[in-house]
A protein has these predicted regions:
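Short glycine-rich, Thr/Ser-proximal phosphate-binding strand/loop in the N-terminal lobe
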Residues: 25-40, 116-122
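Short loop/helix-cap segments at secondary-structure boundaries that form the rim of catalytic
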Residues: 17-21, 38, 60-61
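Short linear Ser/Thr-Pro motifs
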Residues: 10-12, 31, 98
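N-terminal beta1-alpha1 ligand-phosphate binding loop
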Residues: 3-24
């Protein structure tokens, strides 16, 4: 695969690992995009706007490069759950996910400075009930604090997974197959 300079506009170690399944020939430039004022009617539309904003913020400073921007949110009944800000926030999130089905939306945007394309991939996730003891033990680790919804599906949260409908890698923050197909068009 020959591609112009590919830049991942994310500091996520999981996205770096997943993009490496496609190519190891990329650099990382974390976007300085300000997410605070971004709104949208639905969580899926929000995550696409966030991915696009991150992508374009990096693309403007790297003409000629192909930039990949991503964002992931957890959606519980239409309410966006981002990354927890505290132990209590993480516990609140995990209680909301316990024994319930939620959606994970990952927005992906690619731009070469001339053309910009994006998509959202969604996955339904159902957890078994999570005991207070499990929540306490999990929130005592570092695992939940840099992840949307306060969990890492590839980590200890795998123990709570009842079922999922969709792409497992969407939950991790980069739907690899669809992203590869999009990158192949650039």
């Amino acid at each position: 695969m020959m591609m112009k300079n590919l830049i991942l506009a994310s500091g996520s170690p999981r996205r770096k690992e997943l993009l490496s399944l496609y190519t190891t020939d990329f650099t990382i430039c974390v976007s300085d995009f300000d997410e605070s004022g971004v709104t949208a009617p639905t969580p899926a539309q929000l995550v696409e706007k966030l991915a696009r904003g991150k992508c374009l913020a990096v693309a403007k400073d790297h003409p000629g490069a192909v930039v990949l921007g991503c964002d992931t949110v957890v959606d519980v009944g239409g309410e966006v759950i981002g990354k927890p800000h505290s132990v209590e926030d993480a516990k609140r999130m995990l209680r909301a996910l316990s024994g319930a089905t939620h959606e994970v939306h990952t927005g992906v945007c690619v731009s070469d400075g001339v053309r910009t394309e994006s998509f959202v991939d969604s996955c339904k996730v159902t957890f078994f009930p999570i005991s207070e003891g499990e929540i306490d033990a999990y929130t005592a680790t570092k695992e939940p604090y840099d992840k949307a919804g306060a969990y890492a599906i590839q980590g200890r949260a795998a123990l709570w997974l009842d079922r999922l409908e969709g792409d497992y890698y969407t939950i991790m923050g980069l739907p690899v197959s669809r992203t590869a197909r999009l990158l192949n068009r650039f």
